[in-house]
């Protein structure tokens, strides 16, 4: 009879701990995956955007740097 309250208390103490650790692992994985995706998107998008802006500014200032000629 004494084991039942002890078991219930231990169950209540242990059960909230499991979802938090799983939740934390999932959040860490999502953060890492998001950073990896962000790095790939940033490199391609940012560098090509910079090259396009630099090319358009160069073509406006001096037409000898344009690749269209």
Curated annotation (Swiss-Prot):
Signal peptide annotation: 1-19
Main location: secreted
Tissue-wise expression: Expressed by the venom duct.
GO molecular-function term, one example from the UniProt record: toxin activity
InterPro entries membership: T-conotoxin (IPR031565)
Alphabetical list of Pfam families matching this protein: Chi-conotoxin
Reported modifications of this chain: Contains 2 disulfide bonds that can be either 'C1-C3, C2-C4' or 'C1-C4, C2-C3', since these disulfide connectivities have been observed for conotoxins with cysteine framework V (for examples, see AC P0DQQ7 and AC P81755).
Residues making up the propeptide: 20-54
Gene Ontology CC entries for this record: extracellular region
UniProt KW keywords: Disulfide bond, Secreted, Signal, Toxin
Subcellular location: Secreted
Superkingdom: Eukaryota
Family statement: Belongs to the conotoxin T superfamily.
Domain notes per entry: The cysteine framework is V (CC-CC).
UniProt protein name: Conotoxin Lt5.7
Organism (species): Conus litteratus (Lettered cone)
